[in-house]
Amino acid sequence: MGLLEEPRYIIKNTCNNFYEMPENTIREKTFCCGSGAGLGADENLEMRLRGGFPRANAVKYVQERHGVNMLACICAIDKAAFPPLLDYWVPEVGVCGVHELLGNALIMEGETERTTNLRGEALADEAVDDIR
């Protein structure tokens, strides 16, 4: 795809905390979720869990080291494929799209203080502080 630095630029310039997974698991060396090849169906869940283990292991590394609680994906297929994988391997980490992360981080002029994110989920007190 070639979108390697642009999503990172957006996240680094709009969100308070950004942590890269280990260098040997990102950019050109990233592990594909495999769902683009038709493995996204539920009947392939066992294969998806095994195939998603390398990415889940990289997420677990940054979760344990930095307390990461969200994986932001630029790929819509990853955004759909990773929730069941992370629920199994790293249940402390959620999945969102870069666009959603940006939308939650933006505060428009005249906007009233939000109590929910773009999904309508309640914001934790510390999350409100992090966004602002």
What are these regions (language model features)?
Residues M1-R132:
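Iron-sulfur cluster-binding electron-transfer modules in prokaryotic oxidoreductases
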